[in-house]
Amino acid sequence: MNNVTKVMSVSIITNTFLSLIKIIIGFICKSSALLADGVHSFSDLLTDFFAIIGNIMAKKPADEKHPYGHGKIEYLTSIGISMVIIILGLTIINNSMHSKVVMSSLIVSIVSLITITLKYLLSEYIIRKGKKLENNILIASGKESRADVISSLVVFISAILSVFSKYIEVFKYSDKIAGIIVGILIIRTGFLILKENISIILGEQEIKGETLNKIRKIILNN
């Protein structure tokens, strides 16, 4: 098992746990926001699987049909990830707009708070490893996880506001609005990943300093 696979394995285990917890609790409590957040975690899970598959394919040696290797697969995989994320975001917005108005419970707040903590630690871990290994798929996965932290924070705030809906009527829509906001955040993440990887494929992305130094060393040594 290589370094990338190890990192993604940790992410898969964490996202599977969080996704199941949020979807189950969201369904029981009829919370559109928590369900949306659960689907967001599920999209992280899809990202992880894509990352592992893309990394394996990118490591294949060069052949007659691919004399420069299969490195581009890494970026194409990231583009595939971004498309899945965008579709999930649109689906969440649609479902939230047509959901019933409900009051969030204390358990929704607790689950969201736990998620915020775990996802923040996970996202920082993945991004740090991705930069160290110079692996674009890991970085894309880490950014998606970071967006999940923000969406969980939105759910947490909406759950708190919902408690005060008895006194301020407009707060009863907080769960519904939070679901829509989470959907927008997911779509934004998808577009950012899509833009970055298309730029790399088209040669528009600036080469990072560390990579540039390696290229210079290779040229000087030859």
Annotate the PLM regions.
Residues M1-G209, N213-K217:
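Alpha-helical transmembrane cores and adjacent cytosolic helix/loop segments
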Residues L220-N222:
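Short secondary-structure junctions
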